[in-house]
Design a protein with these regions (language model features):
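Conserved nucleotide-sensing/catalytic segment adjacent to the nucleotide-binding pocket
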Residues: 9-79
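Glycine-rich phosphate-binding P-loop
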Residues: 1-10
Length: 199
């Protein structure tokens, strides 16, 4: 959401890896989307790179693998050496966004449900067997999403963040506002770099 808003504010700044892959880069990332193969992913990225970028390149922090597609070395190396920004939001807001995104249509429900047993095995098959599916089937979607965030996704994210240094933290609970703040921060950062290079 934030990446799309930044693109609206500064056309051409963003590289949407998830959009090009048709996958949100998680175990549930294909729900409601059409994942592509590596060849299509590479072709889409090559087309986007040929279009060029009129300013800095803004990319959502991803793992090397987005769905079944691998981020090319050149892009991955640039990501690893890039300035890192961290976005945080309250739990209730994140739950609202995820429910709206993943359960936007009835067609999304069955593919999502089909992945829950796998997550149960990762959380602990004895304690969690059938629990997530039951939450889903009984309409306790908010509770389900909170469990997934608290016990599955957030720990994975925290592990992947080890060793990363963030230049700035932002409150992402208002997409329009945080996109404006990020654009302003980037433009100020670039302006300072230019001034320093001229000294």
């Amino acid at each position: 959401l934030v990446l799309r808003e930044i693109e609206r504010l500064r056309c051409g700044w963003t590289l949407d890896l998830e959009g090009h892959a048709g996958h949100r880069s998680s175990i549930l990332g294909m729900v409601g989307l059409q994942p592509c193969n590596q060849k299509t992913f590479d072709s889409r990225l090559a087309t986007r790179m040929r279009e060029g970028f009129p300013g800095p390149v803004v990319i959502e922090g991803e793992s090397r693998k987005v769905g079944d597609s691998i981020v090319p070395d050149s892009i991955w190396d640039s990501m690893c050496g890039a300035v890192q920004l961290r976005l945080d939001a309250p739990m209730d807001y994140r739950v609202d966004v995820l429910i709206a995104d993943y359960l936007a249509t009835e067609e999304n429900r069955e593919p999502l449900r089909a992945q829950l047993p796998f997550i149960e095995t990762r959380l602990g098959p004895k304690k969690w067997h059938g629990v997530l599916v039951e939450l889903f089937d009984s309409g306790q979607e908010r509770e389900l999403v909170k469990v997934l965030l608290d016990l599955y996704y957030d720990p994975l994210y925290q592990h992947s963040e080890k060793g990363r240094e963030h230049s700035q933290h932002f409150d992402a609970s208002d997409v329009s506002r945080v996109a404006l703040e990020i654009v302003a921060w980037i433009e100020k950062h670039l302006s300072n770099e230019l001034q320093n290079s001229l000294l």
